[in-house]
């Protein structure tokens, strides 16, 4: 079974319902999102982030919401790196709870992982314009990935992607020596562009603002966060 780490906001727990139903054929590990309030409570985001390098990369200062978003994804990498059930060359799926996946997306994700197993990260979603005619996966499609000439094209969206355990371990080791300085979707800032694949046929999309207002019946019984966010932030500061 594919292991899927899903990031959810505790105040929007009901949004997970649809995703969990769609991912019933995988092993789902809920990860409670770091919030901008938790970051701002520390009073000094430099305790969690390398602001100087981030400003050089972004040409501006990242805000607390962006820092929290990045730390939420790093929390998933840490969980993957520590998962003894996964082999180093196994992929795990990272998803943001509000993603709207296509039908049978878990099986399609497995197919992408099998076909592009030499890549460390396989992006299954994309934000913004699609320069290479990327579109949602349809029943007759085969897994097909793109290699962009303009490597910045990899840095649009991080709501759904596969990451190999050895990459998660490498990133976790890096973060024990340095604080993060990238945003969650700036993949080329923390991983080699030539080792990233972008799905041409996307396995999910983010809801429009109108769709976000729609609330489904929550499945509270299976939302069990495995990580204590406060302790995780303390570890980030200590590292």
What does each model-identified segment do?
Residues 22, 236-239:
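Alpha-helical interaction/dimerization surfaces of two-component signaling modules
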Residues 216-218:
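Terminal low-complexity segments of carbohydrate-biosynthetic enzymes
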Residues 3-11, 220-229, 236:
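A conserved hydrophobic helix/loop-capping motif in glycosyltransferases and polysaccharide synthases
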Residues 1-95, 99-214:
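An acidic/histidine-cluster motif and surrounding catalytic segment
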Residues 103-104, 231-234:
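Short N-terminal helix/helix-N-cap motif within the alpha/beta-hydrolase-1
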